[in-house]
Structures are given as C-alpha cells and as structure tokens.
Amino acid sequence: MKEIKGIFKANDLAKYINYKYLNMENKIVKEISPLKLQKSLYFCFAYWGGFIYSGEKNKSELTSSFNKYLFDDRIEAWVYGPVVPNVYRSNEYLQECNPDEMFKGNEYVREFIDGILDDVLKVSDFNLVEVSHQDKCWKNNFNPDSLTHNNEIDKDEIIREYAREI
C-alpha cells in the first residue's frame, strides 16, 4: 500500500470544499459544480504548496513544520484544466464533512484554505478554467491531440510555479 504523503486525501478536502460552498451566502447555484470543485482543489493545492515551498527556501520557522502536499492524489491535465481524477470519478465529496475533526491540529491549514476558498468559490466556473489555463504546468502537460487528455502534472512543478507567485 502506498504511503500517503499529503496532509489530507483529496476526497476529504473535496468534502470540505463542498461543505464550504453549501454554507456560502449569496451563491447563484445551489450545488457546487464539478468544474468549481476541481478548480478549488487545484488552487488550494497550488497556493498551499507554493506558500510552504517558498517558506522552506527562505528557512521560515512557520512553514517548516508543514507538509507542502495538501494531498498526494494524482493531478492530470484535462481539457478544462487540472483535474484530480479520483475525486472526479467518485461522489464522496457529497458525504458529510466534520471540519473540526478534519482539521484537528491543522487549524492554520484550515485558515489558509478558507482564505483561498473565500475567493475561488465566488468566481465563475469558466473564469477559473481560464485562470488554470494560464499555468505553465497545465500548458506543458495538456495534449489537445490526445483522446484521453490524462497526462499527469508533476505536483512539484505546480508547487514551484506557485511559489514564484508568492
């Protein structure tokens, strides 16, 4: 069995994203779309990893105790941007989420993720797609001629790209 090196499983983080969306005020659509869920997962992973990686490079005490991988699940370059396939193929994110239990001992991680989600969940699905299509890690791995569109994106490549933005 493969050792999980992420803080969470992607499906658990997806449950939390869905929980946050369902508890948002003034949302236009009642349920989170698969596109918004996928882009939320991606941007949470990318910004968290970039933040921790840049802290490691600067020898920050704050970030040294955190894992740079929010989750260890595979991320692929699909037509509408980066996708976590095992989340896409399951409906686990619709299950109940207990945020207090999930983030026990990881309150700082929760605050960080909430900051990302407060912005990302307000943006339209296709604006999120547009933003993700600007990322070099997606551009370098997406093959429009492939019938499967499932090239894996290296997680460290994502993290390094976002570390430059921080």
Language model regions located:
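Domain-edge interaction signal
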Residues: M1-I166
